[in-house]
Protein backbone atom coordinates (compact mmCIF):
# COMPACT_ATOMS: atom_id res chain seq x y z
CA UNK A 1 0.00 0.00 0.00
CA UNK A 2 1.47 3.33 -1.05
CA UNK A 3 2.04 6.04 1.51
CA UNK A 4 -0.37 8.98 1.35
CA UNK A 5 1.15 12.14 -0.11
CA UNK A 6 -0.12 15.38 1.38
CA UNK A 7 -0.09 18.67 -0.56
CA UNK A 8 2.12 21.32 1.02
CA UNK A 9 -0.68 23.86 1.35
CA UNK A 10 -2.63 21.51 3.64
CA UNK A 11 0.07 21.46 6.33
CA UNK A 12 -0.30 23.65 9.45
CA UNK A 13 1.33 27.08 9.20
CA UNK A 14 1.59 30.41 11.05
CA UNK A 15 -1.14 32.96 10.42
CA UNK A 16 -0.31 35.07 7.37
CA UNK A 17 -1.04 38.70 6.55
CA UNK A 18 -3.33 39.34 3.57
CA UNK A 19 -0.82 40.71 1.05
CA UNK A 20 2.58 40.21 2.67
CA UNK A 21 2.00 36.66 3.84
CA UNK A 22 4.79 35.89 6.31
CA UNK A 23 7.24 38.40 4.84
CA UNK A 24 6.92 40.96 7.64
CA UNK A 25 7.71 38.37 10.34
CA UNK A 26 10.58 36.96 8.32
CA UNK A 27 12.11 40.34 7.49
CA UNK A 28 11.89 41.60 11.08
CA UNK A 29 13.80 38.69 12.65
CA UNK A 30 14.26 35.69 10.33
CA UNK A 31 16.17 33.54 12.83
CA UNK A 32 13.62 33.98 15.61
CA UNK A 33 10.70 33.45 13.24
CA UNK A 34 12.10 30.18 11.89
CA UNK A 35 13.15 29.05 15.38
CA UNK A 36 9.58 29.55 16.62
CA UNK A 37 8.21 27.68 13.60
CA UNK A 38 10.41 24.70 14.45
CA UNK A 39 8.92 24.58 17.96
CA UNK A 40 5.30 24.96 16.87
CA UNK A 41 5.12 22.76 13.78
CA UNK A 42 6.43 19.47 12.40
CA UNK A 43 9.17 18.94 9.83
CA UNK A 44 7.90 21.08 6.96
CA UNK A 45 6.08 24.41 7.28
CA UNK A 46 4.37 26.09 4.30
CA UNK A 47 5.00 29.84 4.15
CA UNK A 48 4.15 32.70 1.81
CA UNK A 49 6.67 35.47 1.22
CA UNK A 50 4.65 38.13 -0.56
CA UNK A 51 3.19 36.23 -3.50
CA UNK A 52 5.93 33.58 -3.49
CA UNK A 53 5.41 30.06 -2.22
CA UNK A 54 7.94 28.89 0.34
CA UNK A 55 8.55 25.96 2.66
CA UNK A 56 10.68 25.86 5.80
CA UNK A 57 12.29 22.42 6.14
CA UNK A 58 13.73 21.22 9.45
CA UNK A 59 13.24 17.46 9.37
CA UNK A 60 16.80 16.09 8.86
CA UNK A 61 15.86 13.49 6.24
CA UNK A 62 13.87 16.09 4.30
CA UNK A 63 16.77 18.56 4.58
CA UNK A 64 19.11 15.96 3.11
CA UNK A 65 16.68 15.13 0.31
CA UNK A 66 16.48 18.78 -0.75
CA UNK A 67 20.26 19.25 -0.57
CA UNK A 68 20.99 15.98 -2.41
CA UNK A 69 18.64 16.55 -5.35
CA UNK A 70 20.60 19.45 -6.84
CA UNK A 71 18.92 19.28 -10.28
CA UNK A 72 15.41 19.40 -8.80
CA UNK A 73 16.17 21.90 -6.04
CA UNK A 74 18.47 24.50 -7.56
CA UNK A 75 19.88 27.76 -6.26
CA UNK A 76 17.68 29.82 -8.57
CA UNK A 77 16.25 31.91 -5.73
CA UNK A 78 16.01 35.73 -5.47
CA UNK A 79 18.69 35.77 -2.77
CA UNK A 80 21.16 33.81 -4.86
CA UNK A 81 20.51 35.98 -7.90
CA UNK A 82 21.55 38.91 -5.72
CA UNK A 83 24.74 37.09 -4.64
CA UNK A 84 25.50 36.33 -8.30
CA UNK A 85 26.10 40.05 -8.85
CA UNK A 86 29.29 39.56 -6.81
CA UNK A 87 30.39 35.97 -7.47
CA UNK A 88 28.95 35.50 -10.97
CA UNK A 89 28.81 31.85 -12.01
CA UNK A 90 31.41 30.64 -9.52
CA UNK A 91 30.70 27.60 -7.38
CA UNK A 92 28.36 29.61 -5.17
CA UNK A 93 26.35 31.08 -8.01
CA UNK A 94 26.08 28.34 -10.64
CA UNK A 95 23.92 25.25 -11.13
CA UNK A 96 23.49 22.18 -13.29
CA UNK A 97 26.16 20.86 -15.66
CA UNK A 98 28.10 24.13 -15.53
CA UNK A 99 28.42 23.87 -11.74
CA UNK A 100 29.40 20.19 -11.99
CA UNK A 101 32.24 21.02 -14.40
CA UNK A 102 33.51 23.89 -12.24
CA UNK A 103 33.37 21.72 -9.13
CA UNK A 104 35.29 18.97 -10.91
CA UNK A 105 37.97 21.40 -12.10
CA UNK A 106 38.32 23.16 -8.75
CA UNK A 107 38.23 20.14 -6.43
CA UNK A 108 41.92 19.12 -6.85
CA UNK A 109 43.25 22.40 -5.44
CA UNK A 110 41.56 21.58 -2.12
CA UNK A 111 43.00 18.09 -1.69
CA UNK A 112 44.51 17.61 1.75
CA UNK A 113 48.12 17.42 0.62
CA UNK A 114 47.76 20.76 -1.16
CA UNK A 115 46.09 22.77 1.61
CA UNK A 116 48.45 21.62 4.39
CA UNK A 117 51.22 23.43 2.52
CA UNK A 118 49.52 26.69 3.50
CA UNK A 119 49.65 25.99 7.24
CA UNK A 120 52.92 27.86 7.82
CA UNK A 121 51.62 30.86 5.87
CA UNK A 122 48.49 30.96 8.07
CA UNK A 123 50.55 30.91 11.27
CA UNK A 124 52.96 33.55 9.97
CA UNK A 125 50.05 35.89 9.17
CA UNK A 126 48.66 35.28 12.66
CA UNK A 127 52.05 36.09 14.18
CA UNK A 128 52.00 39.42 12.34
CA UNK A 129 48.66 40.19 13.96
CA UNK A 130 50.10 39.23 17.35
CA UNK A 131 52.80 41.86 16.90
CA UNK A 132 50.07 44.53 16.87
CA UNK A 133 48.40 43.21 20.06
CA UNK A 134 49.42 44.62 23.42
CA UNK A 135 48.58 43.68 26.98
CA UNK A 136 45.57 45.42 28.58
CA UNK A 137 44.37 47.10 25.37
CA UNK A 138 40.95 47.03 23.69
CA UNK A 139 40.52 45.78 20.12
CA UNK A 140 37.59 45.13 17.82
CA UNK A 141 38.35 41.43 17.55
CA UNK A 142 35.83 40.91 14.77
CA UNK A 143 37.71 43.43 12.62
CA UNK A 144 41.02 41.80 13.55
CA UNK A 145 39.72 38.39 12.43
CA UNK A 146 38.35 39.90 9.21
CA UNK A 147 41.69 41.54 8.47
CA UNK A 148 43.64 38.38 9.28
CA UNK A 149 41.55 35.96 7.21
CA UNK A 150 41.55 38.38 4.28
CA UNK A 151 45.34 38.55 4.46
CA UNK A 152 45.52 34.75 4.46
CA UNK A 153 43.10 34.29 1.58
CA UNK A 154 44.83 36.99 -0.49
CA UNK A 155 48.20 35.31 -0.01
CA UNK A 156 47.05 31.73 -0.58
CA UNK A 157 44.85 32.68 -3.52
CA UNK A 158 46.75 35.46 -5.26
CA UNK A 159 50.13 35.86 -3.50
CA UNK A 160 48.92 39.44 -2.96
CA UNK A 161 49.94 41.87 -0.22
CA UNK A 162 46.98 42.98 1.90
CA UNK A 163 47.98 46.62 1.51
CA UNK A 164 48.19 46.32 -2.28
CA UNK A 165 45.69 47.86 -4.68
CA UNK A 166 44.02 44.58 -5.65
CA UNK A 167 43.50 43.48 -2.04
CA UNK A 168 42.11 46.87 -1.05
CA UNK A 169 39.65 46.85 -3.96
CA UNK A 170 38.49 43.34 -3.09
CA UNK A 171 38.08 44.25 0.59
CA UNK A 172 36.00 47.31 -0.36
CA UNK A 173 33.79 45.29 -2.72
CA UNK A 174 33.20 42.65 -0.04
CA UNK A 175 32.25 45.27 2.53
CA UNK A 176 29.89 46.98 0.08
CA UNK A 177 28.35 43.63 -0.86
CA UNK A 178 27.44 42.86 2.76
CA UNK A 179 25.72 46.22 3.17
CA UNK A 180 23.97 45.96 -0.19
CA UNK A 181 22.82 42.36 0.31
CA UNK A 182 21.36 43.24 3.73
CA UNK A 183 19.32 46.03 2.13
CA UNK A 184 18.10 43.67 -0.59
CA UNK A 185 17.18 41.07 2.03
CA UNK A 186 15.14 43.56 4.07
CA UNK A 187 13.23 44.49 0.90
CA UNK A 188 12.52 40.83 0.23
CA UNK A 189 14.61 40.96 -2.97
CA UNK A 190 11.59 42.61 -4.62
CA UNK A 191 13.38 45.57 -6.23
CA UNK A 192 15.52 44.83 -9.32
CA UNK A 193 19.21 45.50 -8.58
CA UNK A 194 19.42 47.33 -11.91
CA UNK A 195 17.34 50.25 -10.61
CA UNK A 196 19.49 53.43 -10.61
CA UNK A 197 19.41 53.83 -6.83
CA UNK A 198 22.43 55.37 -5.04
CA UNK A 199 23.05 52.16 -3.07
CA UNK A 200 23.02 50.08 -6.27
CA UNK A 201 25.38 52.50 -8.01
CA UNK A 202 27.88 52.44 -5.12
CA UNK A 203 27.80 48.65 -4.93
CA UNK A 204 28.25 47.99 -8.65
CA UNK A 205 31.00 50.62 -8.87
CA UNK A 206 32.90 48.76 -6.14
CA UNK A 207 32.44 45.41 -7.92
CA UNK A 208 33.60 46.93 -11.23
CA UNK A 209 36.75 48.35 -9.61
CA UNK A 210 37.49 44.92 -8.13
CA UNK A 211 36.88 43.22 -11.48
CA UNK A 212 39.24 45.53 -13.35
CA UNK A 213 42.12 44.68 -11.01
CA UNK A 214 41.35 40.94 -10.95
CA UNK A 215 41.32 40.79 -14.76
CA UNK A 216 44.63 42.69 -14.85
CA UNK A 217 46.14 40.16 -12.46
CA UNK A 218 44.84 37.22 -14.49
CA UNK A 219 46.31 38.70 -17.68
CA UNK A 220 49.67 39.33 -15.99
CA UNK A 221 49.77 35.70 -14.86
CA UNK A 222 48.91 34.43 -18.33
CA UNK A 223 51.59 36.64 -19.91
CA UNK A 224 54.32 35.63 -17.45
CA UNK A 225 53.38 31.94 -17.35
CA UNK A 226 54.90 31.89 -13.84
CA UNK A 227 53.87 29.32 -11.23
CA UNK A 228 53.72 31.22 -7.94
CA UNK A 229 52.39 28.24 -6.01
CA UNK A 230 49.13 29.96 -5.08
CA UNK A 231 45.59 28.84 -5.85
CA UNK A 232 45.31 31.10 -8.91
CA UNK A 233 48.35 29.38 -10.44
CA UNK A 234 46.67 26.02 -9.89
CA UNK A 235 43.40 27.23 -11.44
CA UNK A 236 45.30 28.51 -14.49
CA UNK A 237 46.98 25.12 -14.98
CA UNK A 238 43.95 22.87 -14.53
CA UNK A 239 42.56 21.20 -17.66
CA UNK A 240 39.24 19.45 -18.11
CA UNK A 241 40.03 15.74 -18.53
CA UNK A 242 37.09 15.30 -20.90
CA UNK A 243 38.09 17.84 -23.57
CA UNK A 244 41.36 19.48 -22.45
CA UNK A 245 39.71 22.88 -22.02
CA UNK A 246 40.72 25.36 -19.33
CA UNK A 247 38.90 28.11 -17.47
CA UNK A 248 38.24 31.37 -19.27
CA UNK A 249 39.14 34.72 -17.71
CA UNK A 250 35.51 35.16 -16.68
CA UNK A 251 35.39 31.74 -15.04
CA UNK A 252 38.63 32.46 -13.20
CA UNK A 253 37.29 35.83 -12.04
CA UNK A 254 34.07 34.23 -10.74
CA UNK A 255 35.91 31.48 -8.86
CA UNK A 256 38.36 33.99 -7.35
CA UNK A 257 35.50 36.20 -6.13
CA UNK A 258 33.74 33.12 -4.73
CA UNK A 259 36.81 31.82 -2.91
CA UNK A 260 37.62 35.23 -1.41
CA UNK A 261 34.06 35.66 -0.11
CA UNK A 262 33.70 32.11 1.19
CA UNK A 263 37.25 31.81 2.52
CA UNK A 264 37.34 35.16 4.27
CA UNK A 265 33.96 36.05 5.77
CA UNK A 266 32.95 32.66 7.12
CA UNK A 267 36.17 31.87 8.99
CA UNK A 268 36.49 35.38 10.40
CA UNK A 269 32.96 35.31 11.77
CA UNK A 270 33.36 31.80 13.20
CA UNK A 271 36.49 32.93 15.06
CA UNK A 272 34.83 36.11 16.33
CA UNK A 273 31.93 34.16 17.83
CA UNK A 274 34.42 31.70 19.32
CA UNK A 275 36.26 34.51 21.15
CA UNK A 276 32.95 35.78 22.51
CA UNK A 277 31.91 32.33 23.76
CA UNK A 278 35.30 31.67 25.37
CA UNK A 279 35.10 34.99 27.23
CA UNK A 280 31.63 34.06 28.47
CA UNK A 281 32.76 30.59 29.61
CA UNK A 282 36.05 30.88 31.53
CA UNK A 283 36.06 27.18 32.46
CA UNK A 284 36.11 26.24 28.77
CA UNK A 285 38.78 28.85 28.10
CA UNK A 286 40.91 27.39 30.91
CA UNK A 287 40.61 23.90 29.42
CA UNK A 288 41.62 25.28 26.02
CA UNK A 289 44.68 26.98 27.52
CA UNK A 290 45.61 23.77 29.31
CA UNK A 291 45.62 21.81 26.04
CA UNK A 292 47.60 24.49 24.20
CA UNK A 293 50.21 24.72 26.96
CA UNK A 294 50.55 20.93 27.15
CA UNK A 295 50.79 20.28 23.41
CA UNK A 296 52.73 23.32 22.24
CA UNK A 297 54.97 24.00 25.24
CA UNK A 298 55.12 27.67 24.25
CA UNK A 299 56.16 27.12 20.61
CA UNK A 300 54.28 28.15 17.48
CA UNK A 301 51.71 25.57 16.31
CA UNK A 302 52.13 23.68 13.04
CA UNK A 303 49.89 21.48 10.92
CA UNK A 304 51.54 18.46 12.56
CA UNK A 305 50.06 19.54 15.91
CA UNK A 306 46.45 19.46 14.71
CA UNK A 307 45.69 15.83 15.71
CA UNK A 308 46.77 16.63 19.29
CA UNK A 309 44.65 19.81 19.46
CA UNK A 310 41.40 17.87 19.80
CA UNK A 311 39.75 20.13 22.39
CA UNK A 312 40.68 23.21 20.37
CA UNK A 313 38.82 21.69 17.44
CA UNK A 314 35.76 20.82 19.53
CA UNK A 315 35.65 24.43 20.77
CA UNK A 316 35.37 25.58 17.16
CA UNK A 317 32.86 22.85 16.32
CA UNK A 318 30.62 23.90 19.21
CA UNK A 319 31.00 27.57 18.34
CA UNK A 320 29.85 26.85 14.78
CA UNK A 321 26.91 24.90 16.17
CA UNK A 322 25.63 27.93 18.07
CA UNK A 323 26.75 30.50 15.50
CA UNK A 324 26.98 28.82 12.08
CA UNK A 325 28.72 31.01 9.49
CA UNK A 326 25.70 30.71 7.16
CA UNK A 327 22.32 30.60 8.87
CA UNK A 328 19.99 30.08 5.93
CA UNK A 329 20.20 27.76 2.90
CA UNK A 330 17.66 28.24 0.12
CA UNK A 331 16.69 26.20 -2.93
CA UNK A 332 14.14 26.60 -5.73
CA UNK A 333 11.94 23.67 -6.78
CA UNK A 334 12.20 23.27 -10.55
CA UNK A 335 9.31 20.78 -10.65
CA UNK A 336 6.64 19.20 -8.47
CA UNK A 337 8.38 16.78 -6.13
CA UNK A 338 7.58 14.77 -3.01
CA UNK A 339 9.72 15.48 0.07
CA UNK A 340 9.03 13.82 3.41
CA UNK A 341 5.60 12.62 2.26
CA UNK A 342 4.63 16.12 1.19
CA UNK A 343 4.06 17.31 -2.38
CA UNK A 344 6.22 20.36 -3.03
CA UNK A 345 4.93 22.46 -5.95
CA UNK A 346 7.12 23.80 -8.72
CA UNK A 347 8.39 27.32 -7.99
CA UNK A 348 8.58 26.90 -4.22
CA UNK A 349 11.46 28.40 -2.22
CA UNK A 350 12.79 25.69 0.12
CA UNK A 351 14.44 27.18 3.22
CA UNK A 352 16.70 25.28 5.63
CA UNK A 353 18.47 26.82 8.61
CA UNK A 354 21.66 25.53 10.26
CA UNK A 355 20.85 27.99 13.07
CA UNK A 356 17.58 26.16 13.79
CA UNK A 357 18.91 22.63 13.22
CA UNK A 358 21.88 23.22 15.52
CA UNK A 359 19.63 24.43 18.37
CA UNK A 360 17.22 21.50 18.36
CA UNK A 361 16.98 19.83 21.79
CA UNK A 362 16.09 16.51 20.15
CA UNK A 363 19.71 16.20 19.03
CA UNK A 364 21.55 18.57 21.38
CA UNK A 365 20.56 18.38 25.06
CA UNK A 366 20.67 21.83 26.65
CA UNK A 367 20.97 23.24 23.12
CA UNK A 368 21.67 26.88 24.00
CA UNK A 369 24.59 25.99 26.28
CA UNK A 370 28.18 26.21 25.04
CA UNK A 371 29.53 22.71 25.74
CA UNK A 372 32.48 21.68 23.55
CA UNK A 373 32.73 18.41 25.48
CA UNK A 374 29.51 17.20 23.84
CA UNK A 375 31.59 16.46 20.70
CA UNK A 376 34.27 14.34 22.37
CA UNK A 377 32.53 10.97 21.95
CA UNK A 378 32.05 11.12 18.18
CA UNK A 379 28.69 12.86 18.49
CA UNK A 380 28.83 14.00 14.88
CA UNK A 381 28.88 10.39 13.65
CA UNK A 382 25.84 9.59 15.82
CA UNK A 383 23.72 12.48 14.53
CA UNK A 384 21.40 11.96 11.55
CA UNK A 385 22.75 13.62 8.42
CA UNK A 386 21.20 17.02 7.95
CA UNK A 387 21.36 17.99 11.64
CA UNK A 388 24.85 19.53 11.92
CA UNK A 389 25.49 21.43 8.71
CA UNK A 390 27.83 24.41 9.28
CA UNK A 391 29.40 23.76 5.86
CA UNK A 392 26.21 22.69 4.11
CA UNK A 393 25.62 19.08 2.99
CA UNK A 394 25.16 16.90 -0.05
CA UNK A 395 27.02 17.34 -3.35
CA UNK A 396 27.30 21.11 -2.76
CA UNK A 397 28.99 20.87 0.64
CA UNK A 398 31.59 23.63 1.04
CA UNK A 399 34.60 22.77 -1.13
CA UNK A 400 36.93 24.61 1.25
CA UNK A 401 35.79 22.84 4.43
CA UNK A 402 39.20 21.31 5.16
CA UNK A 403 41.00 24.59 4.43
CA UNK A 404 38.68 26.52 6.76
CA UNK A 405 38.94 24.01 9.60
CA UNK A 406 42.73 23.98 9.44
CA UNK A 407 42.90 27.77 9.25
CA UNK A 408 40.53 28.37 12.17
CA UNK A 409 42.32 25.84 14.40
CA UNK A 410 45.79 27.26 13.70
CA UNK A 411 44.62 30.85 14.25
CA UNK A 412 42.82 30.05 17.49
CA UNK A 413 45.76 28.02 18.82
CA UNK A 414 48.32 30.70 17.92
CA UNK A 415 46.38 33.56 19.51
CA UNK A 416 44.87 31.79 22.54
CA UNK A 417 48.28 30.47 23.51
CA UNK A 418 49.46 34.06 24.00
CA UNK A 419 46.34 35.97 25.06
CA UNK A 420 43.19 35.73 27.12
CA UNK A 421 40.34 37.91 25.85
CA UNK A 422 37.59 39.57 27.89
CA UNK A 423 34.44 41.31 26.62
CA UNK A 424 34.31 45.03 27.38
CA UNK A 425 31.34 46.33 29.37
CA UNK A 426 28.47 48.29 27.87
CA UNK A 427 28.34 46.74 24.41
CA UNK A 428 25.33 45.05 22.83
CA UNK A 429 26.31 41.97 20.87
CA UNK A 430 23.76 41.20 18.19
CA UNK A 431 23.90 38.41 15.62
CA UNK A 432 23.27 39.97 12.23
CA UNK A 433 22.31 37.56 9.42
CA UNK A 434 23.47 38.79 6.01
CA UNK A 435 25.29 36.57 3.51
CA UNK A 436 27.11 35.36 6.62
CA UNK A 437 26.35 35.69 10.34
CA UNK A 438 28.39 38.51 11.85
CA UNK A 439 28.28 40.55 15.07
CA UNK A 440 26.33 43.64 14.03
CA UNK A 441 28.32 46.21 16.00
CA UNK A 442 31.69 44.47 16.06
CA UNK A 443 33.20 42.77 19.10
CA UNK A 444 35.22 44.92 21.49
CA UNK A 445 37.47 42.86 23.75
CA UNK A 446 40.29 43.57 26.18
CA UNK A 447 43.51 41.64 25.58
CA UNK A 448 45.42 40.15 28.49
CA UNK A 449 48.83 38.61 27.82
CA UNK A 450 49.15 35.14 29.32
CA UNK A 451 52.16 34.44 31.52
CA UNK A 452 51.69 30.66 31.93
CA UNK A 453 52.49 29.39 28.46
CA UNK A 454 53.97 26.09 29.53
Each language-model region and where it sits:
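Conserved cytochrome P450 K-helix E-x-x-R motif and the immediately C-terminal K′/meander segment
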Residues: 22-42, 212, 216, 299-340
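Conserved cytochrome P450 K-helix/beta-meander segment immediately N-terminal to the heme-binding cysteine loop
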Residues: 352-379
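Cytochrome P450 heme-thiolate monooxygenase catalytic core
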Residues: 2-11, 75-83, 94, 98, ...
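N-terminal membrane-proximal hinge/A-helix region immediately C-terminal to the signal-anchor transmembrane segment
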Residues: 2-101, 116-128, 206-209, 335, ...
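Cytochrome P450 catalytic-core helices
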Residues: 266-291, 402-417
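Cytochrome P450 proximal C-terminal region
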Residues: 3, 7, 11, 35-38, ...
Amino acid sequence: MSKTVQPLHQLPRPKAQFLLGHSAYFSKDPLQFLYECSHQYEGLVPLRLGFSKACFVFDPSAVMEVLRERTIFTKNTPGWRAIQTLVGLGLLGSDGDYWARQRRLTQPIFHHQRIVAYGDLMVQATDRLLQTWQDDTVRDVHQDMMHLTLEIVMQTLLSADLEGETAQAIAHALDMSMQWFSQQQKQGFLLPPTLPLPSNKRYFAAVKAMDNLIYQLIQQRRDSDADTGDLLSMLLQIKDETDGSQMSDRQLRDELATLVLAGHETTANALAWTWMLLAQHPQVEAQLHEELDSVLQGRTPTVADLPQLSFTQTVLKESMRLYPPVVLLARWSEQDYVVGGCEIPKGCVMMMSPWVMHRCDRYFPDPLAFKPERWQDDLEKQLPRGVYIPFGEGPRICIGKGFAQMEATLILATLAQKYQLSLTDGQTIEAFPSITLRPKNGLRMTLYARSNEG
